[in-house]
Structure formats: C-alpha cells, structure tokens
Amino acid sequence: METIVLPVINLAPIMPEIILSVFGMALLLVNVFVPSEQKAYLGYLSLVGIIAAGVSIVGGWGVPLDSFSGSVVQDNFALFFKGIFLLSAGLTILISDHYMKREGCNQGELYPLILFATMGMMLMASGTDLMTVFLGLEVLSVSLYVLAGFNRANLKSNEAGLKYFLLGAFSTGFLLYGMALTYGATGTTKIPKIAEFVAANGMVAQSPMFYIGMLLMASGFAFKIAAAPFHMWTPDVYEGAPTPMTAFMSAGPKAAGFAAFMRVLIVAFPTLKADWSDLLWVLAVLTMTIGNLIALNQDNIKRMLAYSSIAHAGYALVGFTAGNAEGAAGILFYMLSYAFMNIGAFAIIILVGKKGEENNNVADYAGFATKHPVLALAMAIFLFSLAGMPPTAGFIGKFYLFSGAIKAGYIWLAIIGVLNSAASVYYYLRVMVYMYMKNPTEEFDWMTLSPAVMLCILIAVVGVIIPGVVPSYLLELAQKAVLL
Amino acid sequence: MSQFPLISVMTFLPLLGVVLLFFVPKQSHSVHRMLALLVSLVTFVVSIPLVTGFQSNADFQFVEKMPWIAAGPFQMNYHVAIDGISLWLVLLTTFIMPIAILSTWTAVEEKVKEYMICLLLLEVGMLGAFVSLDLFLFYIFWEVMLIPMYFIIGIWGGKNKIYAAVKFFIYTMVGSMLMLVALVTLYFKAGAGDFNVLRFYEVTLDPATQVWMFLAFALAFAIKVPMFPLHTWLPDAHTEAPTAGSVILAAVLLKMGTYGFVRFAMPLFPDATDKFTPLIATLSVIGIIYAALVAMVQEDVKKLVAYSSVAHLGYVMLGVFALNLQGLSGGMLQMLNHGVSTGALFLIVGFIYERRHTRLITDFGGLAKQMPVFATIFMIVTLSSIGLPGTNGFVGEFLVLLGAFESELRWYAVIGTSGVILAAVYMLWMFQRVMFGELTNPKNQTLCDLNAREVGIMLPLLVLIFVMGVYPTPFIEKMSPSLEKLIVHVKTKQQGAVAQVETVPAAPQVMPAAAVVPAEHK
Amino acid sequence: MVSLHSYLIVSAILFSIGTIGVLVRRNAIVIFMCVEMMLNAVNLTFIALSRHLGNIDGQIFVFFVMTVAAAEAAVGLALMIAFYKNRESIDVEDVKLMKL
Amino acid sequence: MGYELFGLPMIYYISMVAKVLVVFVFVLLTVAYATYAERKIIGHMQVRLGPMRTGWHGLLQPIADGLKLFFKEEIVPSQADKFAFLIAPIIALVPAFIGFAVIPFGETIEVAGYKIPLQIAGYYDTVSGQVVDMNVGVLYILALASIGVYGIVLAGWSSNSKYSLLGGLRSSAQMISYELAAGLAIISVFMLSESLSLQKIVADQANGAWYCFKQPLAFILFFICSLAEINRTPFDLPEAETELVSGFCTEYSSMKYAMFFMAEYANMVTVCAVTTTLFLGGWHGPAFLPGWAWFIAKVYFLIFVCMWIRATYPRYRYDQLMRLGWKVFLPLTLVNIIVTGIVVSLQS
Amino acid sequence: MLGVYLPIIVLVAVAVIFGLASLTFSSLIGQKKPSAVKLAPYECGCEPVGSARERFSVKFYIIAMLFILFDIEAVFMYPWSVLFKRLGIFGVVEMGLFIVILFVGYIYVWKKGALEWE
C-alpha cells in the first residue's frame, strides 16, 4: 500500500479567501446565536473580515506564488482584482444596513453571503485551473442568486432572484460544456497548460472541438459580464434586486467575470488572439450600443443604471479587444473606478428611497439638489464619472481603454466607443436635469442620512475624484497587474 | 521653474474662490456675489502682469512644466505657458469674468451660491484651456468647461433651458470625444514621449492620416465656433442662458473653437489644413451670409445677437484660414472684438430683459426717449458690432478681409464682404425698431434708465471698443511674432510634404523660401 | 467497446435537448430540470473524455459539477418557493413584473 | 465448455442465470414467509398463536394471502394519474429485489472446473485468478435505495388523495433523512476496508474481527437507520393506521397493494443481508457449515431482530423520528468518521 | 465490466417481468365493478373536500434541500474513505476541516429551526 505523495500546499495565495470564508462561517454562527436586535454588529464584523482580507493581500503584491499544483496563483493581476472585490463588498456592506432595516429584511444572512460571494470572486480571479475558476464562479453565483432574491416579501425581488437563477444556471451549462470540450481537446484543465499544449501542437490542437469549447466558454463568460447579446437578464435582475445588491452585482461580480474571462482568453488562448479579438470586437460594439440605446428611454433609475452597466461592460470589452497592456490596464483601472462610482450612485438611490416605495423613477429626483445640495453634488459627480467626463476616474479609465484600442489599431472601435459614450451622456444628464433643473415636488423629508451610507458616499467621491486628478499611482498599479 | 507660477495662480485662483464659497452659508447671497466678484477681480489683476511682462516674441512664456501622470505608455505633464496667441484670450477671459458676474448681480436670485461656483469653475476651465500646452491637459480643461456652462444654462436659464443645455452639452461632447480619439492616435503616431503639443508640431504624418485627424479635431472645434451647419445649438444656448452665461459663451467659449484651430488643428495637420481650406472658407462664408439672413428675420433680440455671433465667427474662420499675417491677426483681433462687442450686446439685451422680461423686438420701440444713456451705449456697441471705422470691429474685419483677399481665398473674401453690409442692415434695423419710433407700449413708458452698476459694467467695454478701434497696435504687436511663427511652421510643413512627394532635389529650394516668409513682414 | 464519439454525441444530444427545453418550456421547475440535464450532459462529456485521455481531471471536475448542481438546486428551489408563495405560480410567463 | 461469448465462457452465463433464479426465488420465498414469521413471532411474543388455520400452524398462510390478493378488485381512483399510479408499485418493487445482486452470499464454488463465486454480479477472472465484483457495490445499493423513494412519492402523489400524498411525502422525507445517516455511517467501514467492493469487505472481515466489533457505533447506527429507511417499526409512520390510514398506499388494492408490501419485506431482507455483509462478516463463519448457510443464518437472525423490535418498541411520533435522524444520528455519524480517522491514523 | 453488469441487467429484467406479470395477472382475474364512490379518494368516509394536489408544508422542501446538500458532501467522503489511509495524517486533517465546515452549516440549519417538526 503505497502512500500518496501530495503536492506541497502553500496557503498564502488563498489567504484572503480563507479569511473571508472563516469570517463568513463565523458570522453565520454568530447570526443564529445573537438576538435580532444586535444584528447590526454583524455588519461591523463583516467589515473587519473585509479589512483583514485586505491586509492579507497587501503583502502579496509583486510576489508571484502558486499553489495546489498550479490551480491557484497569487499574481498582481489577481491581487488587483481582489482589491476591487473587497472594495465593492465593503462599500456594499456600508449601504446594506440602512436599506435592509428600512425594508424590514432579516439581515443575518446578508453579510455572510456577501463575504462568500466575494470569496468566490477572488477564486475566479486567482484560479488558473478551469476547475477553480468554475468553482469560484459558482460560489459567487449561488450567493448572488440568493442575494438578488433576498427581499423575500417583495415580488420584484422574487422575480429577480428567480430570473437570475434560471438564466445563470443556463449560462453555467454553456460555460461548463465549453470547459469540457476544451479539456477534451487539450487534455488538461490547467490554464497555462492549455496554452502550452496549443503552443506545442500548433494547428493540430485547433480542432473544431477546441474552437467550439472556446466559443462556449466565451459565451458563458459573456453572460456573466452581461455582454450583449447575453445581457437580457441584467435589467430585470438589477431592477428587482435589493438596491445594495444591485450595486454589488454591478461592481464586483462584473469585475470578477472580466478577471476570469481575461485570464482564460489571454493566458490559455494567446495563439488565437486574432480569433477572439474579432469575436470581442463584435461583442463590444453590440454591448455598448445596445446598452446605451435602451438606457436612453428608461425612466426607472435602477433600470437605467442596469443598461448603463451593460454599456460599461462594452467599454471594458473595447480594452479587452485591444488585447494589449494599455487595454488590460484600462480594464483593471476602470473596474476599480466603476466600483466607486456605481456603488456611490446606488448609495444615493438608497437614501432617496423609502420603504416599499423606492422612488426609483427619474422624476422622483425633481428638485433634489434644492433639498440636499451636497448629496446631489455627489450624485452629479458619480454621474459625470459614469459619463466619462474629466476630471473623474471614469474619464481616465475610458481614456485608457480607448487608448488601448487605438494603439492596437482598432480605431473604429474606439470611435464607436466614444460616440456611444457621448450618447450615454444624455441619460446621465437626464437625472441631473431632474435633480438640478426641475422644481421640487417632494420635500424629501423621509430621508434619514445614515452615517454608514454617508461614509460610503464619501469614500466613493474620494475614489472618483482622486484617481481622476492624480491617477498615476493607480495606473501604475494597474500596469503592473496586467497579464500581458 | 524657480519663477513665480503666475499662470497657475491665475488659473486656479477662481478654484480658491469656489472653495471659499463652499463655506459661506447658503442664504448670504450678497456675500456670495461679493466674494465671487472679488475673486474674479483679483484674477484679473493677477493676469495683468502677463501682459506687462510679456516679451513681444514668438516664444512661449511664463512656462510651467511638471510631470503629472506617468503610467504605461503615457506621459502627461502639467505644462502651461502663453504666447501671443493665447495672451489676449486669457486677458479677455479674466476681463470678462467680473463683468459677467456683475451683469447678473440682481437677475439671479436663486441658488446664488451655486451660480457663483459655476461661474468661477467655468473661469478655471477656460483659463486652463487657453494656457495648456499639454494636449491631454487641454482636453481635460476643455471638457471641464462644459459642466458649469451646462448648469448655468440649465438651472438659471429661460423657459426652454433644459433643451438648450442638453443640446449644448451633447453637441460639444460628440465633437470632443472624437477629438480625444484623434489625440490618442496622434500620440501613438508620434512615438514615445509626452503630450506636449510642441512635440507634436514636429511630427510629420502622412496626408491621409492627417485628413482623418484633422476632421476629428476640426469637428470638435467647429462645433464650438460654431461653424455652419453645426451652429444650431448656439441660438438655443444663447437665448436660454442667463445674461452672464450668454456673455461668457459669446465672449470666451466660442473663441475656444477658433483658438483650437489656430493652436492645434492647423499646425498639427498642415497638409490637411491646406486641403480643407476651401471647404472651411466656403462654410465660413455660408455662415456669414446665412446667419446674417436669419438674423434679419429674428423676432427675439437675443437670438438676433446670437446669429450675429455666428456671422462674426465666420469672419474669424475666414481670416484664420487665409493663413497670412493679416488674415490671422485680423482673425485673432476679431475674436477679441467679438468678445467685447457681442458680450456688450448680450449685456444690453440682459438689461432690457431684466426690466421688461421680454426680448421680442415688437414689444419695444421708442426706448431712446425713455432711456437716453442706454440708447447711447447701445448705439456705440451696435456700431462696433457692425464694424464702423473707429470702433474695434472695423479693424478686425478689415484685416480679415484684407488677408483673405491677399490669399487664395480672394473670392470668398469678396462674397464675405457682403456680410458686412448685411450686418449693418440687420443690426441697425433692429436698433431702430427697438430704440426709435413711437413709445407705444405703455409698459415701456415706465422704464428707468441704466443705474450706476449697469453703466459701470458697460464703461470698460466701451473704453475697449474705442481703444481697440483707434489704437490696435499693442494688441497686434504682441501677437504677431507668434502668428508669424505659426504661419512659417504650417507653410514649411505643407511645402515640405509637397517636396517629399515630388522630387528630392526640390527640397533645398524650398527651405530658403520658407525662411524668407517672416522677413517679408518685418 | 463504445467509442468516445458515441459518448460525445449522446452528451451533445442531451445538452441540446436541455437547451431546447430551457428555451421552450414555461414551468420554472421544468426549466431547471432541463438545466440539470445540460449539466449532466457535461458530466457525461467529462467522464468520457477523462476515460479517453486517461486523465483523472475530468472526473474530479464532475464531482465539483455535481456539488455545484446540488447547491444550485437547493437555492433554486428556495427561490421558486418564495416566488410561488407570492404569486401562486411558477410559470416563467408570470415573471414579468419588470418589462420594458 | 469451450465456447465463449463476449470474452466470457458459456458456463459463466449458465451459472449467472442459475444464480439469478435461485436468489430471486429465495428472496421471494423469504419475503412470503417473513410475513408469516412476523405474525407468528409477534403472536407468540404477545402470548397468542398467530395464523393457525391454513396448513399446519398456518404454514400455507402466505400462499393464501397471495391468492386472495390476486383475486381482489383493482381500483384506480378516478382522479389519479393513471400511468404514475400503475408504475409506482413496480418502481418500489424492482429496486428492492435487485439489491441482492452485489451481495456475496457464499464462498466460491467449483463446478466442472470453473470457479463460480456466490455473488450475482461477480465472476471469477481466470487471468488474474481473482473474483471480480462490482467495485462500487455499496454505492449501487445506496442508489437503489434512492430509487425506491420515487415509487413511494409517485404512489402518494398519483393517488390524488390527501392521505396518500401526505403519507408519500412523509415517507420519502423519512427515507432520505435516514438514508443520509446510513450512508454516512458506513463510511467508517470503508475507512477500514479501503474498498467499496463487498467481496473485499467480506474478505477483510474474515482476516480480522467483524466490523460490528471494530465499529459498534456505526453498526448500530446503520442498522437502525436502515430500519427507518425501509419504514419498519418503530419507524413505520408512513403507514401509521392511526394517523394516515395506510399512508401512500391508501388508494391501492389487489396486487399493486401487495407489491408495496413485497417491496417492504424484500427491502428488509436486503437490508439485513447488507448489514450482514458489512458488519457481521458476511458468509464467513466456522467451517462446520458452508458459507451460504452462515449467510442465511445471519440474515434470518437479523430479520428476527427486526420483528423482535417491532414487537417491543412503540411507534415514534413523526417529529421525534425526524429529530432523531437529523439531530442525533447525523452528527453521531460525522463524529464517528472523525474519531475513526484519528484512531486509525494514530495506530499506523 | 460486462461480467459484472450483465447479471444485474438480467436480475432487473426478471424483477420487472415478475412485477408486470403479477399486475397483469391480477387485473385479468380480479373482478371489476367500479362505481363513482368507489373511485373517489378515501377521506374517512366523508365527501372529499378540494383537490389533493395542493400545497404542503415547506418543511418537506427544506428536508429535500438539506438531503441534497448533505448527500453531496457524503459523495466527497466516499472516495476519501477508500484512500484515507494512504493519505496519512494530512487526509484526516483535511476531512476534519471539511466536516467542521459541514458542521457550521449544520449548526446554522439547526438553530434556524429547519430540523424542527411541529
């Protein structure tokens, strides 16, 4: 009976994941043992977990490691994304308490689920094995299905959860089938090994099975990042889900989708770059255009932001299509700033809403600036950043994305991108028109300015403005984090 | 770099005002007004040493340069300086700002704090755009200007303000976004380095690329100018904006477009400039005639003035694209003139609008009897706008037409001249309908004349109208070297390109010829 | 012995049936069962390929897929129950509160 | 016997058919007489005689019961889902009978020079000289147990009767709950045997002590869980006459009803056989008796224990039952696994 | 392979044939006198009220979900149990962690009251 020799396992690369899991589980247990009036502490505890995980990733910067026989890695790319995930999770937690209390939801499970979802995202970013990526994706997705339908008493939330679940599971099927075929064609599920195999076997490796596998995987990922034509779920889910979760979904998981998508395409299929660039070109154009065009006539602000988030995925795809370091760094930077600006915008949407009546209609914002000038200013900053106006992080991000495309010679793509971005200004301005240029119809006296939400807004404003004015440091980080 | 960062101080001084305003309580409107006025005056004072310290040569002066963003392939600097081209525009901006603030001293009653913040932010944007030598920095300021202007029109504007504001924003945005693409393309074509515009001047691009990039830049600038047929946002924006907005829009923002042509589009893409000169000249002339004709039938005084702006800027474009010293300096001067006289016109429209809350020509008539001071001032400004000799308008238009006549744009100049006559027709006709005749409307009989503040606002403008009309030399003197340098640069590169295309031995012949050009004007 | 191709073809057919089922059926539970069928088709593919390649990775993958499918099933059922409680239906035609 | 088919000698096929028939008839007879034995044993335990009329001491009673059921009227409720109603008893019955396929019930015998292991799903591989059986035999049995649930759920649902439905649901909830605990309980056995092959497990016990001594906790847990899984008293809630009439089979009559009963008793036999194999050393025993005899003896003893329990213990309440399964047995099995793991790795 | 699975197929066939045959046989020889009352569902002799195809307690769903989850966890333990001796102490620690995590969920479910039947 021979002993099985196991590979040396280094836990350092998955330290943040471990911390989050431990905190998540601890919170679950704490949740069932503390009386319901003390559940607010769960939020603080989960923030501690987020910060602890954040601390654990700092030391890993610039120290490439891999573990579990190459199933997970710790590289700058993964770490940068982990930072984005932690950030969006932290901001989401800040805005959750207020909302959930108002809607009368039981928050006990909320925080563990957010932590688990974040853990899943991290796994997606650091996984270098299709299996790890898949597992991360599913940990994320399953948590999100619940989070989307978290407000059980609310019909829209139910619908959002169900819809997200059905379509999400459906897309998982495609992703998996793609992974299976890729595995069949190359004989491995390790992403770097796939690349090695293709490099070694050249055209022989590029069987129909291989191409179909890549295509199916791409469509699976495209669903997760809500790229057209796989975006149909986004508006309904974003509209129906509890607002903090909408904020979370649009920031974290989308970035995670990009992380996995980028790693798979860039690392595993570098030799097929011409093929997937063409594919992404089409995806990017469709995604930007469809997202923007439909967003133009949305009255519901959550829905409008949902379509805008589709459009933003399109901009990020522009950088991806470029397939060069600028484009990739642009995606990293953009995802980071998108987390700030989008969650910030949602934080204000949460403040404006009241129980049962979320005031999500654009017209509900009439005269908001008169009543709450500072909040309106913050909202304006977020919206300008989303629209890509300087001097905000949104502009720098877009600049990088489009620069990448231009450098790679995709000038037309960049032009379509900027035209889209100009069109998108219309619907962002619309909100501002209501906030600043219409007379108030409401007193907005139901609003309670919860300190946690205000803190979130403050962080978001700083996170939008500072990188917009002095982006060097962050861009530098993003540059160092790209896989290319 | 050890010298005093005069430009930065000037540019960001209004920002300091913004910060201060944040801390002033919401209700103390008079404090807001005073503070904003004070800041803008100080800014103006700070900008005066730029003129006095300016050496009349072609160099960039008061240079400040420090690294700003450095990441990946990009290197952006905070690089500001002025030369003869931007000097006067900067001065015009700092000069117009206090006037603009004063102009809506009483007209804006609501959200005064926000209003003043917007105005001051706008000033930062405009000054920044004029002084930037780094294309990226320029772009940032260019876009930043949009936001406060959008709010000024949208919040404090007239009935149709939202439509006008959004239209203004989106028009400008579309153009500038394409410019961004071209800008990045240019950067990559130029190879490693920074966004310094002077560096880009030296880059030689193949004519086909130039065409595309010129189009992208030109679109952005042409929208801003605005050139026919991209001008449709302007009448709306002007009509709906509060007086200060209109004044700034006319006096400074539109110059941003023409300035863009002079500073960027032409020197960067000389071959394309050459190629597109006929087209632009055609559009300018169409603009002159068309705008004049449309102005003639306007019912609304403010709209009429807005269309006259379109016509005036047609002259500027014509002069600029004549690409000789007369034309260019005429164009530059016309920019200043237009800033002064159209700004003044908008102020005047603002005065009567404040009194009567209408701008329809038919609502007035015979005001001269009731308001003699007003009538006098209005007359002077109208004449200046028409370009009567002795006023500033004349010098500019004359130089433009002269320059155009001397260049290959001769026939355009001929047609453009008719615009002068048309301008006289519609301006005077309007003046006559408003000021003379029977004082029929009873509401007009109680109108009171301009008060001290209003006269005080107008006085500096009137002074300038005459000074620039009678003694324009100092203005031209300071800008000429820079303009000459520009002309040489553009022409050399145009011919250089031709030489490259043609036979190689032709090149040495061209070089001395290019060197001769400035000598002619000395 | 049955060849790899037969397995792949069977799993492709299963996958297609699942896909079509998802697209044409209206009952949420049936849709979910179709999704499960797709996952199982994938599992079959993995097993067949794993056997063909003599590489254990595919089988390990199947373990994870099964686990995930179970978790999804649990969550999915819970969501459907919540939906049914509020709406007395699990027909996806009724999932239409938020349409354009 | 030189002929071969698909690489196997003809005698393999002959012996296979023989084994199948013998086992099937054996199970059938055991099932039939288990019903008789149950009535008799419980009768005697309760100091009465049980069936006495048909045959000597009522020995023909099962046959009489069977015949009676054959002649009964078939009733299919008008609102029932006909197909599901019809198929349900078969789904319940078949897994109960085929579980025996993987259980080794005796030592390898030799017929005409060909070695035949006494296990249906097994054969002697002449190349390696070993008995080849299903290497995941235990999983097979667990899988069958799961399939059996479908029969019951379908029966309950298709009858369109509230008692049936509730009975079916309760029964399936109970079955899956205890299936879980049972499945976890036997993991500690595999940790000792390092195999899921029942042949291997039996062989392992022959070399050392029976697993019921090495894993007493697992043994008890498994046996109790199995009883619950097959709805034996004291866990026969689904058919609790006092609460739910006849549970899932309320609407059934005639042979269909009989088939549920056959399934239940067949399950009992299978469970006892599995327990024997996993914990009681299978067919091994002192050599004075042949292996199959030891096997039958052990199985019959366990069947007797089942009946004994029925006669002794009162029925559980449903909430007690579920609580017992989830809150006591489940954690116990997990603890057992960990303790076994620690002890075993400390020993080596 | 075949040697192991063929007998099972045969056994299944025998069992199915037995089942079908006895069903057919009994339905052939059994009497048939259906009536509306006889075909109605049994409700202690009362008239049946409403349909039986209605909602039932959510408890059953929860048990079903819990079963799926724990059963799948068990799936991971089976391969481990066969190999655990060869994995050495590491294997025990790993499975210990696994079971601890399982226990976290278990305690959560317990405290949430999913295991209570009232």
UniProtKB/Swiss-Prot annotation, chain C:
Protein name per its UniProtKB record: NADH-quinone oxidoreductase subunit K 1
Membrane topology, from the record: Multi-pass membrane protein
Molecular-function annotations in GO: NADH:ubiquinone reductase (non-electrogenic) activity; quinone binding
A GO biological process held by the record: ATP synthesis coupled electron transport
GO cellular component, one term: NADH dehydrogenase complex
Highest taxon listed in the record's lineage: Bacteria
Principal subcellular localization: membrane
Entry-linked Gene3D superfamilies: 1.10.287.3510
Function description: NDH-1 shuttles electrons from NADH, via FMN and iron-sulfur (Fe-S) centers, to quinones in the respiratory chain. The immediate electron acceptor for the enzyme in this species is believed to be ubiquinone. Couples the redox reaction to proton translocation (for every two electrons transferred, four hydrogen ions are translocated across the cytoplasmic membrane), and thus conserves the redox energy in a proton gradient.
Species: Geobacter sulfurreducens (strain ATCC 51573 / DSM 12127 / PCA)
Oligomer status and interactors: NDH-1 is composed of 14 different subunits. Subunits NuoA, H, J, K, L, M, N constitute the membrane sector of the complex.
Keywords associated with the record: Cell inner membrane, Cell membrane, Membrane, NAD, Quinone, Translocase, Transmembrane, Transmembrane helix, Transport, Ubiquinone
Family the entry assigns: Belongs to the complex I subunit 4L family.
Transmembrane stretches, start-end: 4-24, 29-49, 60-80
EC class (word): translocase
Signal peptide (UniProt feature, chain positions): none
InterPro entries, alphabetized: NADH_UbQ_OxRdtase_chain4L/K (IPR001133), NUOK/Mnh_C1-like (IPR039428)
EC number of the protein: 7.1.1.-
Cellular localization per UniProt: Cell inner membrane
Curated annotation (Swiss-Prot), chain D:
Keywords (A to Z) from UniProt: Cell inner membrane, Cell membrane, Membrane, NAD, Quinone, Translocase, Transmembrane, Transmembrane helix, Ubiquinone
UniProt protein name: NADH-quinone oxidoreductase subunit H 1
Protein species of origin: Geobacter sulfurreducens (strain ATCC 51573 / DSM 12127 / PCA)
InterPro entries found in the cross-reference section: NADH_UbQ_OxRdtase_su1/FPO, NADH_UbQ_OxRdtase_su1_CS
Function of the molecule: NDH-1 shuttles electrons from NADH, via FMN and iron-sulfur (Fe-S) centers, to quinones in the respiratory chain. The immediate electron acceptor for the enzyme in this species is believed to be ubiquinone. Couples the redox reaction to proton translocation (for every two electrons transferred, four hydrogen ions are translocated across the cytoplasmic membrane), and thus conserves the redox energy in a proton gradient. This subunit may bind ubiquinone.
Entry GO terms, CC: plasma membrane; respiratory chain complex I
Superkingdom as given in the UniProt entry: Bacteria
GO biological process: aerobic respiration
GO MF, one example: oxidoreductase activity, acting on NAD(P)H, quinone or similar compound as acceptor
Record field: catalytic activity: a quinone + NADH + 5 H(+)(in) = a quinol + NAD(+) + 4 H(+)(out)
UniProt enzyme class: translocase
Family: Belongs to the complex I subunit 1 family.
Membrane topology, as annotated: Multi-pass membrane protein
Subunit annotation: NDH-1 is composed of 14 different subunits. Subunits NuoA, H, J, K, L, M, N constitute the membrane sector of the complex.
Subcellular location: Cell inner membrane
Main subcellular location of this protein, as a coarse class: membrane
TM spans (from-to): 11-31, 83-103, 136-156, 172-192, 208-228, 268-288, 289-309, 324-344
EC numbers for this chain: 7.1.1.-
Top-level taxonomy: Bacteria, Pseudomonadati, Thermodesulfobacteriota, Desulfuromonadia, Geobacterales
UniProtKB/Swiss-Prot annotation, chain E:
Transmembrane region(s): 1-21, 60-80, 87-107
Membrane topology summary: Multi-pass membrane protein
Subcellular location: Cell inner membrane
Family annotation (Pfam families): Oxidored_q4 (PF00507)
EC identifiers of the protein: 7.1.1.-
Gene Ontology MF annotations: NADH dehydrogenase (ubiquinone) activity; NADH:ubiquinone reductase (non-electrogenic) activity; quinone binding
Keywords, comma-separated and alphabetical: Cell inner membrane, Cell membrane, Membrane, NAD, Quinone, Translocase, Transmembrane, Transmembrane helix, Transport, Ubiquinone
GO CC term (a single one): NADH dehydrogenase complex
InterPro entries per the UniProt record, alphabetical: NAD(P)H_OxRDtase_bac/plastid (IPR023043), NADH_UbQ/plastoQ_OxRdtase_su3 (IPR000440), NDAH_ubi_oxred_su3_sf (IPR038430)
Catalytic activity: a quinone + NADH + 5 H(+)(in) = a quinol + NAD(+) + 4 H(+)(out)
Main location group: membrane
Subunit structure: NDH-1 is composed of 14 different subunits. Subunits NuoA, H, J, K, L, M, N constitute the membrane sector of the complex.
Similarity comment text for this entry: Belongs to the complex I subunit 3 family.
Function: NDH-1 shuttles electrons from NADH, via FMN and iron-sulfur (Fe-S) centers, to quinones in the respiratory chain. The immediate electron acceptor for the enzyme in this species is believed to be ubiquinone. Couples the redox reaction to proton translocation (for every two electrons transferred, four hydrogen ions are translocated across the cytoplasmic membrane), and thus conserves the redox energy in a proton gradient.
Protein known as: NADH-quinone oxidoreductase subunit A 1
